[in-house]
């Protein structure tokens, strides 16, 4: 409500490019869209350093992080095509090849042995500081965090979308009220929490 959260639609990488935001909690693959240069409204620009860190945790919270992303599957086909697909997947997930592939895209390796045996050495070969920082954060996350996955529900995507839309809508309204009467921020915080409790217990 005090203006510290980006509430507009679209990806959070956009406000980073214009200096409207300075921190983003995002997918690791967002590194593909980050820029080491900020361009301001007056068309001036400056170089910045982008640093990746493990997901933030409240002081009394558990170190947990959601694991999600694109998957690969096969469809029923001819024996030759199915064999070719399996051969490709084995090649892609072979430890060293997989590390080489993922470190160019911001993804995580798919095997534990990749973290243990290959990733530390691969980081030394990276030339882009953004990627070096990202994969150092990966090593920290892999060692110190517990991974969880989204519930396997047919309605999950719809629930997630509605959650995001409601949060943006409510916070945008309350943010405007805070701008109009900043002295009421404590009251608005309580009202906002109450609104969310009502919305998410229905």
Cite the ranges covered by each PLM segment.
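A generic secondary-structure signal for well-formed alpha-helical elements
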Residues: 28, 38, 95-99, 174, ...
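An extracytoplasmic/periplasmic, membrane-proximal ligand-sensing/linker region
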Residues: 114-148
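Flexible glycine/proline-enriched surface loops and loop-helix/loop-strand junctions
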Residues: 17, 67-72, 143-149
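Non-transmembrane alpha-helical segments in soluble domains
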Residues: 1, 13, 17, 86-93, ...
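Extracytoplasmic/periplasmic substrate-recognition and gating elements
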Residues: 1-3, 11, 39-112
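Conserved C-terminal helix/tail region of periplasmic/extracytoplasmic solute-binding proteins
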Residues: 139-202
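Extracytoplasmic ligand-binding clamshell segments of periplasmic binding protein
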Residues: 1-40
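Active-site rim elements
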Residues: 2-5, 73-76, 146-155
